């Protein structure tokens, strides 16, 4: 079985949208606005926890699981089993990031910015081990 590598895009999105997977594609788009807020206001561990949880969630969508509630439960189960129930990633998966990072609610916007950045070398699973 072969899966095409995933592409990761950073784009400033409305603050109520953390990330999304483009259905039928290999693209995950993460909200750069939220990443910037967490990075400047929280610890590196909290930032990494957010990234882990969001990437896990969108990765599950990339397998074709479209039911949002099912993916949320799967994300929580995965975070809890790997990191423990009280880990920040598990708490965000269970209650949503806005419950864990209430300061995100201070930055309300519905604006989609056109500019985006493609993260290079995000998923190298399609590359050969022998060059």
Where are these regions (language model features)?
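Short acidic, glycine/tyrosine-flanked loop/strand segments centered on an H-E-D-like triad
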Residues: 29-56
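Active-site recognition of the HExxH zinc-binding catalytic motif
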Residues: 49-65, 72
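Metalloprotease/metallohydrolase-associated module, dominated by Zn2+-dependent proteases
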Residues: 1-18, 22-37, 66-131
């Amino acid at each position: 079985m072969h899966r095409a590598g995933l592409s990761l895009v950073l784009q400033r999105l409305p603050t109520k949208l953390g990330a999304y997977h483009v259905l039928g594609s290999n693209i995950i788009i993460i909200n750069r606005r939220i990443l910037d807020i967490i990075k400047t206001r929280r610890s590196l561990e909290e930032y990494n926890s957010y990234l882990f949880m969001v990437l896990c969630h969108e990765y599950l969508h990339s397998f074709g699981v479209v039911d949002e509630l099912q993916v949320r439960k799967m994300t929580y189960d995965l975070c809890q089993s790997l990191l423990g129930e009280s880990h920040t990633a598990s708490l965000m998966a269970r209650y949503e990031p806005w419950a864990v990072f209430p300061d995100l609610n201070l930055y309300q916007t519905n604006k989609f910015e056109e500019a985006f950045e493609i993260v290079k070398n995000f998923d190298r699973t399609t590359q050969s081990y022998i060059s």
